[in-house]
Amino acid sequence: MKEGFQIGRTDGRIYAMGVTAVAGGMHFSYASKGKSCALLLYKKEGTAPLARILFPDGLRTGDVWNVTVLGDFEGLFYTYEVDGKETPDPYGRQFTGMEHWGSLGRLGGPVRCPVSGAGEIYDWEGDTLPRIPYEQCVIYHIHPRGFTRHASSGVKQADRGTFKGVADKIPYLKELGVTTVEMMPPVEFDEIIMPSHQDSPFEPEIPDGKLNYWGYTRGYSFAPKSAYSGGSGKEPVREFKDMVKALHREGLEIVIELFFDGKEAPAYVLDAARFWAHEYHVDGIHLVGHAPVKLLGEDPYLSRLKLLAPGWDGVEPGQVKHLAEYNDGFMMDMRSFLKGDEDQLNRLVYHIRHNPQQVGVINYMANTNGFTLMDMVSYDIKHNEANGEDNRDGTDYNQSWNCGAEGPSRKKRIMQMRRKQIRNALLMLFLSQGTPLLMMGDEFGRTKKGNNNSYCQDNDISWLNWSLLNSNSSIHEFVKHVIRFRKEHSVFHMEKEPALMDYRCVGLPDVSYHGLKTWCPMFDRFLRQLGILYCGKYGKKPDGREDDYFYVAFNMHWEPHEFALPNLPKDFKWHIAFNTDEDRVNGMYPRGGEPVLENQKSMMIMARAIVVLMGKEVAPLKKAARGKAAGKGERREEEAHDTVRGNDTVYRGPQAGGIRSSSGTGQNTGALQS
């Protein structure tokens, strides 16, 4: 042991694993089955240890080595030596030697932890967690590097691809309307995939310098990744906390992904989850890989922390709804329905309604592993050639349809169909009862060029190209509108799953299913049409008033179908909130400007389209006033409003024309007005 350091007396306490600041020094705890263990102290650039302190065998508790060392640790770094082999601390809170992303020059170099960081105090300035319930959440899934790494991000160069870059985009997130940011693994891991030789003549070699861009690998689960810190990567701890504080200040939540491969001790996983909740004020953790979900799900320290996992079988939920299911079931089934597969109606109604009272549900139409939303409507097959594995990696089950051409297309018909299918997908997502999740960039047509497994693509394939905000502005506007629409109407995000019953005795069930005829739902395997009626008396608007009535008509058949419309109470009329077939209005109508259906008993829903009707109360007009207005304004309105045409119906814009039968009789079956 070097002069200036001495082993202090133990006080009999049980210390947390890793490093803990104590009076006059530091306490070190390390778990190992080895026969001997030593603490090695270094100066930052030192190659030889400044001090080697052997853990006294008498202070060993089971397989946990403990020692309190007194002295000045300023500017020093540490590792452990077990049976003569040097190893980093798995409980380390920050690491040096990994600051430069993808640098092959650091291979074989030392990876050490600063000692002093364990005792630093951060000023949270009264930070509080928003604690947004699942039914009010809209999750936005990002990669901490790829979100702002592209030059088009508008973030200054030094902050691109960093935690600070994420914080700089908070105004954009607020404008979009999301409430919660989910971040792919932000912990320290080695992104360099070591080259490997082929095991057989038919398997490709993994080339030198390949990077693990996603971060789903074993890492150091207590340290934020230094390469995601600005400048030279010296302050990842402070920058991550600054980002969290900035998000909370604007009412946004942060959920992080932690990956475990199942080889970790359950106590290590539990310690990591508790640490991020306490030390970094994260609002939730998405457990990826293999984690002891029962241990975490029933832990009292985590009972108010959002915990996301593929399933929670066998876990006893607490009083607060903090657990949530997170898997691909919604995505795969809804994509199948979207592209017109048969026998999907039962799955549609299940996912639209699914929202258990004690466990949340996370829904998405696209996520990390698979096609983006734009690629889902642009490619029939994966195109992973850039991964260097002969296109063998990644799933072959994408449930996608390219709308008539593989990859980019300039054909107007194909582009219109793709936009419509994206609008359909977004309505399916945001009108379902579970918590919607949007993958970064899907709100403005991000593409990964058909790559559905971009785990190693640290380039334009994975980085978010913000210039698409301009070229695909219609998708962006639609997403903002549908998020706002969902927030304003609680019938689409109830606290518990709809009962399909009139349990309040208001004359209608909370939610009911309909076929082409009202109150006659049909679920035959060959059908692709369904109507869903929402009774507004079971929901509240943000101002506390009763919600509106809604009728959502789904037609994923490649032919149009006429839907009978449910009757509304007296003085209520149906208004068109969304019609995904109407490309000229981007499939939506502004709040307060929804066209009204006058005395209309049915509506033709075009092929592969979704129509959302809103039942609102309309003040009755006196006949004289109506006649006077009609006489003076008839000609002016005919000239002012465009005509909207479909294969089976012809109607004019607000306050014009009638619905004409496709039979050619010209019979007026109802006027469409605003």
Language model segments and positions:
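The feature marks proteins involved in alpha-glucan
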Residues: 1-23, 49-51, 59-143, 148-154
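Carbohydrate-binding surface patches
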Residues: 25-35, 514-566
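Conserved, mostly hydrophobic/aromatic
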Residues: 30, 80, 142, 173, ...
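C-terminal beta-strand-rich structural cap/linker in extracellular carbohydrate-active enzymes
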Residues: 32, 74-76, 593-628, 670
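Conserved alpha/beta catalytic core and glycan-binding cleft of carbohydrate-active enzymes
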Residues: 105-108, 112, 281, 293-445, ...
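Aromatic- and acidic-residue-enriched carbohydrate-binding clefts of CAZyme catalytic domains
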Residues: 153-162, 193-249, 253, 260-279, ...
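Carboxylate/His-rich catalytic cores and anion/metal-binding grooves
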Residues: 174-210, 370, 378-382
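C-terminal accessory region downstream of the catalytic core in glycan-modifying enzymes
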Residues: 482, 559-594
